[in-house]
A protein has these predicted regions:
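Aromatic (Trp/Tyr/Phe) and Gly/Pro-enriched flexible surface segments
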Residues: 32-280
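Secretory targeting and sorting signals
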Residues: 2-30
Length: 280
């Protein structure tokens, strides 16, 4: 389905992860480059651990709880990081990393064309290595606009720009309804997605405008390209809601992507347009 160069990917199995696993079973990426580390789950993430990860982007008054709506059986797909990377964290000491491979790879040196992990499991909605992270949130009174800051990073740059199948990041409120079409008619339907570029496309290596990908923005990470820091917004009502963040691969299980997420906030706005714009 992809170009032959896909075979160059370094695929890391569950038995060969380059991490240190402590008594709690939590993976920690070790690095002497800068202070901080990346702490990921041990594969079977509890609701308590998911909530800890979620609360890196907002406090307990906003993030009531969190869990996975879907996740692949292998790979450390979610992490809380105190390691400064690409301008994160934005506020507070930590931020969230979600991946469709292994979040612990984020600060590895970029020494090859690609580094990834086959996270396994069956296809979900036609996609592979699907991570769907669900947060139960509470919107304060008087606020009607949700803002979420993030940066999408990928190993698919530049080899797979303008390819039909790509990793993608999607953000939805209250329901997650995105779906993919099979090989032969490749497309993604995501009517509720509010993390889109200026043309309404999902965030991927093919995004345009403020959400376009280049190599410079991924400096200091294992990834070959990244977007600017973006702010995705959508209208919302006060009270309880669910926020779904999804990252997946539509075509293969090899070249992986991640999203750094921080600073979930709410404001009162006369106009609150769906979509992602530069936050730099």
């Amino acid at each position: 389905m992809r170009a032959a160069s896909r075979r160059r990917a370094t695929i890391v199995g569950a038995a060969t992860l380059a991490v240190v696993v402590g008594a709690t079973g939590v993976g920690v990426a070790q690095s002497g480059k800068t202070k901080g580390n990346i702490v990921a789950d041990a594969g079977q993430l509890s609701r308590m651990e998911a909530t800890k990860i979620a609360r890196t982007i907002a406090g307990p008054k906003v993030i009531r709880s969190a869990a996975f709506a879907a996740r692949p059986p292998y790979g450390r797909v979610a992490a809380r990081s105190t390691k400064p990377l690409t301008g994160f964290p934005l506020s507070g000491p930590s931020y969230m990393i979600l991946s469709n491979g292994n979040a612990l790879f984020a600060d590895d040196k970029n020494t090859g064309p690609a580094k990834g992990q086959n996270a396994g499991g069956p296809a979900i909605r036609g996609a592979r290595d699907v991570t769907i992270f669900r947060m139960n949130i509470r919107v304060p009174k008087g606020r009607n606009c949700l803002d979420l800051r993030f940066r999408f990073l990928t190993e698919e740059f530049p080899e797979f720009v303008n390819e039909e199948f790509n990793d993608a990041f999607i953000a939805e409120v209250d329901q997650t309804t995105w779906d993919t079409r099979p090989v032969g008619d490749p497309s993604i339907e995501a009517d509720r997605n509010f993390a889109t570029d200026t043309k309404g496309n999902r965030i991927s290596v093919n995004a345009v405008g403020d959400a376009s990908v280049n190599a410079k923005r991924a400096k200091g990470t294992t990834y070959d390209g990244a977007t600017r820091r973006l702010r995705a917004s959508t209208r919302i009502t006060p009270g309880g809601h669910r926020l779904y963040l999804s990252i997946f691969d539509q075509g293969d299980r090899q070249y992986d992507s991640a999203v750094f997420v921080d600073r979930l906030s709410f404001r009162k706005a006369a106009v609150c347009e769906n979509g992602a714009v530069s936050d730099e």
